[in-house]
């Protein structure tokens, strides 16, 4: 089986690797994004871990690298998982850069996450002559795990991104709504984004998750009470890995994008 072969190779050659996936993201009016992501344990701590998360995204011949470090700790008889993380994001074609920080609270019934993004790079000119500027921003996300045997979740998120230049008033605010489901080694997600810049769109992704043998859990009992979430210790941080930019044309018109 493909997953077992990849898992065996990773465990033999990368002992610290705890999670690995390959993903295809689809969004209306944009070309697809292909990505690979891994979570690697740096150090075990009491009822927790210190870890590294690395991902590489390819969108429209544009690559973005995300390198993050975080800590997670299990509390309350392993029914609550708290975490904090920090990231550095680098987009290669225009050399956009930013840093980010996040916190998370994870249970068997619901999860809450918050992320902040701070642009480091200034104005850049892309290959079409358009000026781009990485944006500052934040997002909040809540996931509810449906009380059924299948691994199905619904989520809602809010976000705000803005041009950090003091002379600019450009801002993107909005919400995302969606659901995801785990089917064997595949994770399927779909939803809708609604924002204030007429950039509303449907989105979806399909992710192939390599089975390392630590993420399987029986969900057939205690569906409405808090249960052990130690199986989520190495799940990836949920954040926006592509760098949002504001695009400024020669006429002065502005638009958001990646």
Which stretches of residues belong to each language-model region?
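Flexible, glycine-rich linker and terminal segments associated
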Residues: 1-12, 120-155, 159-168, 182-187, ...
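Outer-membrane beta-barrel initiation region
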Residues: 1-63, 249-258
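Feature captures outer-membrane beta-barrel proteins of Gram-negative bacteria and organelles
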Residues: 8-10, 32-45, 63-77, 99-116, ...
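Extended interaction regions within the primary functional domain
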Residues: 13-29, 43-49, 69-78, 84, ...
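Transmembrane beta-strand segments that form the barrel wall of outer-membrane beta-barrel proteins
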Residues: 18-26, 47-58, 80-91, 101, ...
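Solvent-exposed loop/turn segments connecting transmembrane beta-strands
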Residues: 25-34, 56-66, 90-97, 164-173, ...
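Residue-identity detector for threonine
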Residues: 33, 49, 54, 64, ...
